[in-house]
Amino acid sequence: MSSACRSLMVVGTSSHVGKTLLVAALCRLLKKAGKKVAPFKAQNMSLNAYVTPEGHEIAYAQALQAWAAGIPPAVEMNPILLKPQGNLTSQVVLNGVAVDTCRAGEYYERWFAPAWEAVKTALARLQQQYEWIICEGAGSPAEVNLKHRDLANTRVALHLGSPTWLVADIDRGGALAHVVGTLQLLEPAERALIRGIVINKFRGARELLQPGLDWLENYTGIPVVGVLPWLDWVLPQEDSMGLEAGPQLWENRRERAGRGSCLEIAVIRLPQVANFSDFDPLLAEPSVHLRWVHPGQSLGSPDVVILPGSKTTLKDLLALQKTGLADQLRLYSGHIVGICGGLQMLGQTIADPAGLEGVAGTYPGLGFLPLTTVLQPTKVTQQVQTQSRWPAPAPVQGYEIHQGSTQADPAGCLPIFEQEGLGWRDPTGRVWGSYLHGLFDNHRWRRHWLNELRRQKGWDPLPELEGHYAQQREELLDCLAEAWRPHLEWQQLLE
């Protein structure tokens, strides 16, 4: 190990306490302090994925943290990605490549040893390149029934000898008890690494909390290094569990934007929804109101319905059919969009000859576009740069993550991009779909599409935008770091 590289581990009392954003904020603060810093998460379970420039698949959360650090995302930052497929099975992505689909017990039998070797190799490579590694744990480090096969928490901290911060979510209630209970369940060597406690999502006056903090420090002997305020704005969620607050947050955006000339876009909340980060740029548009529609709910009368990506296209398509949402879509007269798995659903048929998603066979799609898809074992993971043909010529960049090849009938649909196989539309433009994740990140293309919708409603166009959502994301990451800077004793890391 390189003695020049320092590290900090961030673990939590449970999932969704704010570890991901704290790591992102620390990466940005250290970057601003002139340090070469990289994020790391040994194992992530998420359907929100990103493709690195080399074509490796990692969790989107680690890509976000890499951008916060001012560096390109790399596979070493997330060597193991587990993508749930339902029925207690997950696709195993090791070193950026899908290698297996198995149940939890099978995963630990087949992949625990090679996964730990991949973790150590990834850390060694990062240590050779960076001055700092900010490591994120997963869930809680104190799950005693899982400790012997936990790759992501104190095993990493012990391997690095890394000082560790423990994060608790006070908004849920019981934060002090969560901290004390977590510490009591750790082994002595693990507890000795805990050098700081962070209380996250705090609302109210610090002085009202201070007696509890004093007690906590006295009882545990560990300093409270941060009391982070609740942030009333949206950054990307790590996984679909974080979307449960989504409808409320999206409705709040609507209240702030007002009901003026505001396009309403409904996104179908598929059971295995994937890459919902695709919609962050639309969420940032003040003239757009997004809302989730769960299978079984009424579609309403939105201007646009989007079928997002799915880890299990056939299962999610069946959910639409069983709950009546497919019938609602057939009666719907507005615009329909499909992204990745959603694109596949818009076609005539989806064939699964190898039974990748269950029983082998050919299944009917929704029938909105003359497309036929064949699911294939080989996964496509690559970044893309191309030019759009519709709704106007514009440079476009994004990335593909899919298992399947789609063929289009040129008599019934038109290509959207210069590069073949990325997306198609019907002759009217009312229905379209694309394999391209990150499509809405392209400012110019997104505004062309939104303005076409506005034109059809007789509304004035929005100003054209050049550039990419990455610029707004940079501003959000700066805001995150500056919002937490005065509430976090991060400068002790530099001592």
UniProtKB/Swiss-Prot annotation:
The keyword Lipoprotein is assigned to this record: no
Annotated source species: Synechococcus sp. (strain JA-3-3Ab) (Cyanobacteria bacterium Yellowstone A-Prime)
Nucleotide-binding as UniProt keyword: no
UniProt protein name: Cobyric acid synthase
GO biological process terms held by the UniProt record: cobalamin biosynthetic process
Keyword annotations from UniProtKB, A to Z: Cobalamin biosynthesis, Glutamine amidotransferase
Family: Belongs to the CobB/CobQ family. CobQ subfamily.
Pathway(s) annotated for this protein in UniProt: Cofactor biosynthesis; adenosylcobalamin biosynthesis
Disulfide bond positions: none
Protein function: Catalyzes amidations at positions B, D, E, and G on adenosylcobyrinic A,C-diamide. NH(2) groups are provided by glutamine, and one molecule of ATP is hydrogenolyzed for each amidation.
Gene designation: cobQ
GO MF, one annotated term: catalytic activity
Residues of the active site: C340, H437
Record-linked PROSITE patterns: GATASE_COBBQ
Family annotation (Pfam families): CbiA, GATase_3
